């Protein structure tokens, strides 16, 4: 059986067709066009699936990687920073158009599964995968299988409370991790401190003045406390970082030290590594979730 994986992102939708050995047959990327609304996204996804399906005569399985979690009871999307998806039965609507069942999972779980089986965490038993981009998400893989929890929210460390009564989050809570260490939050904090609106990749090029040092110190402290809490609860064999924020080099030395300083144990050597698959993790993870589903 061949596999189609779709990665639905905030700015792009990527699709891939793989054979049984995970060799790429066809790959395509299109724009998401959130401004055109929910129905446009459903149409774009189903059209891309049909286009990829036409490239093979084999049977197919389809997996879709989405921002946000599918509510286990109602089947609607929640906790998505792609706001037009919120409250919508995305899986059901796609299946109605295609005429067959698909598998759907959130982007952090797809990322973690892909990195566990094909990437930086290959060979480790208990893996915590982190996405720090527009938002903050996490996933847990144990012995090669996703651990999703009773209500599909296992690993959602981005909505742990870092500061009670802190920054407002789109989820309705205050003080969520996401509102402090996502790329969006970091750029917002930089603007507050300096009055400059700059992309994160520019900000980290020069952190020599006092405001920049303050920004970095706050970031490292929040990163360290947030991940230390995960280690205290899960004690994973490895943590893999993904998303645009994961490209910041100092997270892997200074950042790791801040994590270690805040962990309960005095014996701590948890590897904290950068992802191997880059922005391909989503589509590969979408294909891999179909393996889990069809076992």
Describe the residue ranges of each PLM region.
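A cytosolic small-molecule/anion-sensing beta-strand core signal
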Residues: 19, 66, 142-143
């Amino acid at each position: 059986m061949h596999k189609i994986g779709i990665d639905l992102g905030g700015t792009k939708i990527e699709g891939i067709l793989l054979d049984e050995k995970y060799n790429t047959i066809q790959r395509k990327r299109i724009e998401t066009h959130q401004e055109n609304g929910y129905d446009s996204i459903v149409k774009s996804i189903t059209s891309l699936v049909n286009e990829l399906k036409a490239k093979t005569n084999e049977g197919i399985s389809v997996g879709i990687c989405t921002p946000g979690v599918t509510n286990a009871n109602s089947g609607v999307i929640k906790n998505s920073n792609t706001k037009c998806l919120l409250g919508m039965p995305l899986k059901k609507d796609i299946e109605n158009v295609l005429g067959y069942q698909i598998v759907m999972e959130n982007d952090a779980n797809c990322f973690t599964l892909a990195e566990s089986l094909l990437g930086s965490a290959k060979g480790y038993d208990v893996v915590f995968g982190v996405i720090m981009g527009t938002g903050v998400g996490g996933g847990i893989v144990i012995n090669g299988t996703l651990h999703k929890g009773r209500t599909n929210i296992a690993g959602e460390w981005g909505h742990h409370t870092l500061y009670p009564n802190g920054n407002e989050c789109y989820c309705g809570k205050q003080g969520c991790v996401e509102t402090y260490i996502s790329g969006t939050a970091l750029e917002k904090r930089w603007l507050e401190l300096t009055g400059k609106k700059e992309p994160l990749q520019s900000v980290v090029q020069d952190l020599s003045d006092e405001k920049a040092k303050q920004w970095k110190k706050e970031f490292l402290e929040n990163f360290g406390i947030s991940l230390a809490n995960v280690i205290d609860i899960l004690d994973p064999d490895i943590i893999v970082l993904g998303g645009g924020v994961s490209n910041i080099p100092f997270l892997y030395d200074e950042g790791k030290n801040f994590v270690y300083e805040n962990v309960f144990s005095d014996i701590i050597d948890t590897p904290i590594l950068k992802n191997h698959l880059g922005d391909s993790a989503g589509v590969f993870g979408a294909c891999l979730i179909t393996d889990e589903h069809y076992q």
